[in-house]
Amino acid sequence: GRDRMRATMLSRLPEDLGGARVLDAGCGTGAMTAELAARGAIVTAADISPALIGIARERLPGSLQSAVRFVAGDMLSDDLGRFDFVVAMDSLIYYGITDILAAVGRLAARTDGCIAFTVPPKTALLSAMWTMGRLFPRSDRSPLMVPQDHRALTRATAGRIAHVARVSRGFYISDCLEHRA
């Protein structure tokens, strides 16, 4: 599922990213980062986890190292600079709608092209799992994903956020959305 979603998100960007500045917001282990750099982008790969940044750096082929700047820190920081494009795969899944809109707004203020991002869809199954998780909280669990109705995000932005596709494969289900300036 994640491979298909990555391909879906990449399809929103030009095939030739030669010289384009791209933020991989919440880059994780760097799979998207490597694909962006291989397509010619100048990538800023940001993640809050220094451990994941270390893994991403190690996995990146040597021939692509000069095209990537790794940053352990806030993916929304203005200090990261301006970008032509932003991708945020599974980076906003723990945010409520207000926080998603604020995050996308902050990114949009310094992005010239599209912002492709994912949210967990508001399906009956995910909503039930979310409710159960809230009823039985435990401190040793990851934060709960917050299912989103992509139509609410579209309405809240007067159509600047559009639904691209839903990817559902195995245990992975997510909606790809796109913000256009």
Name what the model sees in each region.
Residues 29-74:
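Class I SAM-dependent methyltransferase SAM/SAH-binding core
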